[in-house]
Every structure is written in structure tokens, then in C-alpha cells.
């Protein structure tokens, strides 16, 4: 099968970046970049660019980790979206580049450690309590949502810089409700 011109451009990009001589974490965010690092392309990157050691997977497709592990077993997978942490942890992950731990660091790290140690029975209800909130990390308003979550718990998130505008009042209220729900879970468990 022939590779697409875009795939060749992606390979050329990583080869150029690799000239710096340090390990590279590829970032798959097809929503914002309009370039999808498919498992087949990740396999090709793994074969042709040894400096790429990991991928931050933000496609939202939880099936991909299994394909990446099969096609590019040397590439470590890092969770790139908060709302797929538990699903990807079932396949074994190497890390989590996350948003909402800025607002809820202790709770998020507890969840991460339970999930990565395979303690899914304890992790599942915790994840359920956080999931609606975590889903904001996969929306275009994620920066505003995380900052608002930080403000909610007394960690200064502050206003966003332009071009990001404050969230509409109904979305702010929703985030406050979701923060309250998550905090109540941790307080009452």
C-alpha cells in the first residue's frame, strides 16, 4: 500500500525535529491540527524515526491504543485527554498529559495511580464522579473550563487571554455543578 503525501510530510517533519537529538513525544490531536497520526502512521514513524519514543494520544478513539501497541510496540502511549484515562489505562499507559489535575491534583493523581495499577474496581466510581468534568478537556473551551475549575477550588486560574472569551453563564454554572459533584464524591466516600 502506498503512503499518502501527507504521511510522507509527517515523517519528514519528525525526521527534521529528530535532528535536535533528544527523545520526541509525538502529539496526535486530529481535531486541532487536522492531521491524524493513525496507528499505521505511528508504526511508520516508529520504524523511520527512532527518536520518537512516545505518543500523546488525543484522538478519543480508545481502540487505538491496542492497535498502536500491536503495530508500534516500542512507542509508549500517553493519555492526552482526561475523559479517556480509565479506558486507556486498561491497555497499559506510560503517562497522562492532563488538564483537570490543575484543579483537582490530589483526586486526579489518586485516580491515575489506581487506574495504572489495575485497581479498576476502586477507580471506576471515582472516574464516574469526575468524568463529566473531565470531558471538558476534550472540548474547544477546555482552557476556560480548567481555569474556572481552578478558581472554584481556590487555585487561581484567572481569566483567559484573547482570543479566548469567558464561557457563557450557563456553561460556567454547569462546570460549577460538575465540580461540586466531584468534590462531594471525594468528601463523602
Task: Map each language-model feature to its residues.
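Charged helix-capping and loop-helix junction motifs
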Residues: 7-15, 38-42
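Alpha-helix-loop-beta-strand connector modules within alpha/beta enzyme cores
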Residues: 11-26
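Catalytic alpha/beta core domains of metabolic enzymes, predominantly
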Residues: 20-22, 32-140
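Conserved short secondary-structure transition element at the edge of the structured enzyme core
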Residues: 89-92, 131-164
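Short, small-residue-biased leader/transition segments that mark boundaries at the very start
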Residues: 1-3
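Flexible C-terminal active-site loop/helix
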Residues: 155-189
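Conserved C-terminal portion of the radical SAM core fold
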Residues: 29
Amino acid at each position: 500500500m502506498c503512503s499518502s503525501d501527507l504521511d510522507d510530510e509527517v515523517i519528514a517533519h519528525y525526521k527534521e525535529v529528530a535532528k535536535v537529538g533528544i527523545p520526541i513525544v509525538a502529539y496526535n490531536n486530529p481535531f486541532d491540527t487536522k492531521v491524524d497520526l493513525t496507528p499505521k502512521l505511528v508504526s511508520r514513524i516508529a520504524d523511520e524515526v527512532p527518536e520518537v519514543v512516545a505518543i500523546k494520544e488525543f484522538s478519543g478513539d480508545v481502540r487505538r491504543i491496542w492497535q498502536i501497541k500491536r503495530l508500534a510496540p516500542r512507542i509508549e502511549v500517553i493519555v492526552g485527554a482526561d475523559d479517556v484515562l480509565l479506558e486507556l489505562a486498561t491497555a497499559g499507559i506510560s503517562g497522562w498529559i492532563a488538564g483537570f489535575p490543575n484543579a483537582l491534583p490530589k483526586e486526579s493523581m489518586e485516580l491515575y495511580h489506581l487506574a495504572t495499577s489495575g485497581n479498576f474496581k476502586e477507580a471506576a466510581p471515582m472516574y464516574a464522579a469526575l468524568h463529566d468534568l473531565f470531558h471538558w478537556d476534550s472540548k474547544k473551551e477546555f482552557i476556560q473550563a480548567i481555569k474556572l475549575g481552578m478558581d472554584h477550588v481556590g487555585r487561581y486560574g484567572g481569566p483567559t487571554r484573547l482570543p479566548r472569551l469567558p464561557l457563557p453563564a450557563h456553561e460556567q454554572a454547569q462546570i460549577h455543578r460538575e465540580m461540586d459533584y466531584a468534590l462531594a464524591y471525594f468528601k463523602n466516600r
